[in-house]
Each structure stands twice: as structure tokens, then as C-alpha cells.
């Protein structure tokens, strides 16, 4: 049987933790004002995206529901900070959290199987869009990615749907990293070249074909959210962002902020066309 977190208490906790995180991150941003330069964002229509999370009930053997809720609130706030810093007209909001005993940690190894099994076990359908056509990203949350059949990855994103998985003990940037993949963003060159013989080989094998500018970046020994660096800046790669005077991207190869903006614009056009 599936259990739901009390909606009112969850929302209050999300608001509280979110406010605290925003204050902390804002102060951090101000303290680094001389070393990190963010662009001035132009006003535009905003795409509001929803996130539905399905939590392995065995998580509660290690963590309380309050702790899990605080982690989810942190992920949400981090995502919105990344989008804001990168001038991407989009928001994230976790609107549904479902605890279920149906999830098995072995699912972490095969996201496609996890998605199919979860859809079969849930009483309600798993949505990919809201009633007005806005995107819904669905994620399976595990307790520990190390114990999930010794997974090499802290999070995984589907190549064919808006489905992802991650663990409670993953870095706070992981959720936005995976949703970035679901929106068309790719890793930095260093990570891509560990798994492919060349960037051209990766692009040729991707479907839909990855734009040449869809890669993450490193700058001044730090990485953007799609990189695998230990020190992550809460931004998508963009030539408009600088760290210690060094650009965190370029127009030709490392501009995931553009990728996300194009995703937002495409979705908004679909939503608006359905209204007419």
C-alpha cells in the first residue's frame, strides 16, 4: 500500500527549509561577488515544472520522514537557484511525494525497468505533463546509491522519458543534474570523453542529436551543474558567467543555459498553442 506525506506539513517544512537554504546560498553568492559574475536576466515568460518523487519505503529504516522532506526541499531550492543564476525562465516545484514498499534497490541498475515496474505497481498513473501541458519530471528516491547493487552513479536519467532516479545521500545538485539531462543538457567534455572515443562520436550516437553547444564546463577549477567536478557552482554552463574572470562556457560548445532556455521556450509554445 502506498502512503502519502501529510500535504500541509510537507509544504510547511519545504517552505521553511527552502527559505533557510535561499538565505544561506544568497549570502554565499554575495560573499563570492568578486570572484563569480552572474548575468543580468531579461524578463520573459516562465515555465513552471513539477516534480513527483516516489520514495523507497525502506529509506525510513535509516531516515525520518522529516529528514527526507528537508532533503527534498533542499534539492528543490538548489534547482531553482541554478535556474535563477543561469537566467533560465523556469521553476521547479516538488508537488507530490509518495512512499511505497514496491520499490527495490536493484531498480537503481536499470532505470527503464524501474519505470515500467513502478507504473505497474502504482494505483495512480504517472504523469509526464500537467493538465495545462507543463512538464512533470518523475524520480525514484533510494536510501543509498552505494547499497543499490553497488551503483557507480548517484543518479540516472532516462533517455526516452522524463524519469530519473537518485539517492538520499547524493549531493544536493544531483536532482537538477538529472533533470538537466531530461531537458537536453550533457556532461562536460572530460566526463564525455571517459565513455566515448570523441565528442563527435558522442553527438553522432545521441538521439535526438545533441547540439554542439550542449555540454557542461569547468572554470577556475570548478564545475557547472552538469560536470563531475567535486566543487560545483550552482549554474549551467554559459559564456555570460565568469569565475575569477574565466568564462564558464562559450557559445560554440559549452552553453547548457541556452539548452535549458530552448527547452523552456519549446514547452511554453506547446502550452500556449493548446490554449488557442
Regions found by a protein language model. Give the residues of each.
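Boundary at the C-terminal end of the N-terminal hydrophobic targeting segment
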Residues: 31-35
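Extracellular (secreted or membrane-anchored) zinc-dependent metallopeptidases
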Residues: 36-276
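General helical secondary-structure elements
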Residues: 7-8, 25, 112, 257
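Short amphipathic alpha-helical segments with coiled-coil-like heptad repeat character
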Residues: 2-4, 88-89
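Bacterial N-terminal signal peptides
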Residues: 16-25
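Bacterial N-terminal signal peptides that target proteins for export
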Residues: 3-17
